[in-house]
Amino acid sequence: MIGGDKMSKLFVVSDIHGFYTELKEALNKAGFDEANEDHWLITCGDHFDRGEQPYEVMKYLINLPRKILIRGNHEQLFEDMCHRGYAEMYDLSNGTAQTANLLGNVKELQGDWSEIYDNAMRRARPFFNRMLNYFETQNYIFVHSWIPTLPGENWDGKPWYTKNRFDVFNPNWREANQVEWDDAMWGNPFKQAEQDLNKTGKTIVFGHWHCSAGHKMLGHCNDEFEDAIWEPCYFKNTIGIDRCTAHTGEINVLVIEDEFLN
């Protein structure tokens, strides 16, 4: 049983994006002690891309005795690229191709790309096998972006990136298939919270979308990047924690206490 029936201290991070040094600094500052049996680390997806230490991130997390790893859309991009055997332009701009190089211990993009990606996926497979789509405690649900929803009556078939997409709450979200979970990893969670799509009775903790966007939505700041607020954003029974590490050089650590489900 994970955690047993006692209160545990949960240290929650998201969107590490290959920044191992920043992760360790943030956890140390928050008081995380991997030797403490009451301390658990929960990562809300997007462990790789953009930073230059994806292997260090993967090695550190896989060796932690108490952790929960959540799958994000960048893990989806990485798997898709490796299975495809070649990089699309967005894989180059997102840093996914570079992640494969770093995980595969390749210095430069050269040679047989499919071999590079096969090697990277072999090294990453034990890590990927540990990832969940969500994790639930007595009072919280941890996801990368959101839980799977259902299309609303006015849905026009447009995909996740459409700004005017409106969904409805899915009471059977726990039974969603992987395609539905993959779709849920891409939307704007602050917009979904604004549409009152959290009817779970619990607080949804997410990353994916920089928390400054939520603060701007609430009128706490005027811009998402200039003079922005990067602290966790509490909004309609949700908490957004993505600090946009590639921009800020920092990672938020949300520390909460809760009981695991029996």
Language model feature labels by segment:
Residues A100-N101, V106-I239, C244-G249, F260:
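Acidic, His/Gly-enriched loop-helix segments that form or flank divalent-metal centers
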Residues E37-D38, P54-Q138, V168-P171:
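Active-site neighborhood of divalent metal-dependent phosphoester bond hydrolases
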Residues V12, L41-T43, L69-I70, I141, ...:
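Residue-level marker for buried hydrophobic side chains located in beta-strands
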Residues H17-G18, D49, E75-Q76, I147, ...:
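Short, glycine/acidic-enriched loop or turn micro-motifs at the edges of active sites
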Residues G4-K6, E34-N36, N63, Q195-T200, ...:
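Flexible, charged surface loops at secondary-structure boundaries
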Residues V255-E259:
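Short beta-strand-to-coil "C-cap" segments at the C-terminal boundary of structured domains/repeats
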Residues D15, D46, L61, G72-N73, ...:
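Divalent metal-coordination and catalytic microenvironments
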Residues M1-K59:
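N-terminal active-site segment of His-dependent metallophosphoesterases
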